[in-house]
Amino acid sequence: MSLELYKEVLRMVLPNALLDYFDLVDVQFRAIPANERLGLESGEVIFYLDELDDFRGKEEGHTYRPNGFYEASRVKDFPLRDKRVTLIIRRRRWVDEQTGKSVGNKYSITTEGTRHTLEFAAFLKETFGYVPDRGLFT
């Protein structure tokens, strides 16, 4: 199977346009102990994503140098089969050499006030009338 085919499958699984800005760097599977299960889930799929090295907020006359990553964010997404899905997202950080300030790209990945992807939070709100913090799907 070609790399492009894998990427197309990932685009169907991961939130909209995420792979336009992030590389999938690892996938881990974790069993959920029976006493921690809230429903039928048997495990968790954890996708690790690192932002591509492309700062888009450049100001004319400024130079930027890479400066590692911000602290990783844990984001909940739609379950896959009987597995919870967690995205571990690391955004890159650059230093503006003219100002010394740390800068980075901004993304709308989660719904405000939640750790859920936009699509997942919208689904939960439509289904339950609110976005639960913990439950069968989260």
Segments from the language model and where they lie:
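Glutamate identity and glutamate-enriched acidic tracts
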Residues: 4, 8, 36, 41-44, ...
